[in-house]
Amino acid sequence: MMRALMLCLICSWLAGCAVNPATGRNDFVMMSERQELELGARYNQEILKQYPRYEDAKLQAYIQRVGERVARSSHRNQLNYVFTLVDSPDVNAFALPGGYIYIHRGLLAYLNSEAELAAVLGHEVGHVTARHSVRQQSQSTAWGLLGQAAAIGTGVGAVGDLANVMGNAFVRGYGRDMELEADGLGAQYLARGGYDPQAMIEVVKVLKAQEDFAREQAAKRGESPAAGGYHGLFDTHPDNDRRLQEVIGPARALAGGNQEVGRDRFLQMLDGLVFGDSAASGIRRGRHFYHGELDFTLTYPQGWQLVNRPDVLIGHTPDEQAFIAMTLEAVDKRLSPAEFLRQRVGNQRLVAGEELRLGVLQGYTAVLQGQSARRVAVIYRGDNAYLFVAAVKGRASLEAEDQRFLEVIRSYRPLKAAERKLAEPVRLHLVRVKAGQSMTGLASGAPLAADGEAQLRLLNGLYPRGEPRPGQWLKTLR
């Protein structure tokens, strides 16, 4: 029985071998190109629910043009590539199978030329042409099959779990290699498309500076730095990264004499770009949250951090041991706030319930009993129900944090007229540097945090100690 299963697995592996269109190597894949295209089209709709398109038709068209210019020089130029700027402050970009590529406006803000934009898009095109997501999916499937075969053959389910762990580790181990491969392919597409392939190195410098800044900020707060973001973690500076320089090298040989950078044209396209939170998702300012479209504000305890996503707002303690999440749902006006909560928790028991009176607004709050007790609440306003769920983990206890949870819930109120300005987003604006101007002076008038000068340098590729030149276009915030 075991031999037959292993034979089937080997046959599946042989059937799944295909020549990679970008590298010419035989890759193990268990998905046809047609299936790849169908998968990308299906998940594109899900992605756009989570990350809506940024509302700027001119900028969207520009990004599509730059992306198509790079993709035309790729190994899979027959695909219909779709490049989308998503309305998210995250520094990120990613690709789905089949040619759906997304760049977050948070990353776009830190780029400083059209060639750098082309480098980001070219890197993601490289992931598509090399079928990285397809290869990862196929590796995971194959290791899962191996685990099933071993479990059946030995009668020990733990063997299957071990194989899955090995498989996941194997796929994760591809991370650095795949990123470098995408860098090399993207640089080739840049050069063939008429852009300077050095822009790929410049983008990695931008990301390295982001990582260094985040590490410095975490150290000031006495925290550990977060895990690597877009493109992973960098052990060395890009100029000294031997493997990175090696994969970019062949692209330099393809470059002609007039490779395009397009700094000023690109910066003009960014003038007015929303930076940080958008009006549609609400604005975080210190420990306060303001939402102009929904007309409300919330206040959190001093030192808490806020995570703002399209579908949820989360406030949590610095050690992430206590958090409160708020989501928005439609009101069923046949139900009172108390009935709404009871319906939501089903057969779980609510205790210590009490009505909430927030001016003219009505709500209800209670503790949801169970192995991990939670504070829950709902506030009715118009056609919306604002649902709060608060919980603790680790050494924290609900009793110790509950008063602060209630203070957050009870801080909900409509905006005052003077606060409406606080619900408007910060935007990028271009200024031409005058003789004698410094980053210190330019940062003093910007709506930035305590390290605003460092933040402004990051935006302009001048971190950590660079200064602008007279006559240079510079990104500022207001």
Residue map of PLM features:
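Surface-exposed amphipathic alpha-helical segments
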Residues: 118, 254, 390-429
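Primarily a LysM-type cell-wall glycan-binding module
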Residues: 419-450
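K/E-rich alpha-helical interaction surfaces of small helical-bundle regulatory domains
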Residues: 293, 299-313, 399, 403, ...
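Short, surface-exposed polybasic-and-hydrophobic patches located at secondary-structure transitions
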Residues: 316-328, 426-435, 476-478
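A Zn2+-metalloprotease active-site environment signal
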Residues: 5, 13, 17-300, 305, ...
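Extracellular LysM carbohydrate-binding repeats and other cell-envelope/extracellular binding modules
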Residues: 452-478
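Signature of long, low-cysteine stretches enriched in small and polar/charged residues
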Residues: 325-327, 341-387, 391
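Residue-level recognition of short, solvent-exposed, well-ordered loop/turn junctions
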Residues: 38, 299, 434, 463, ...
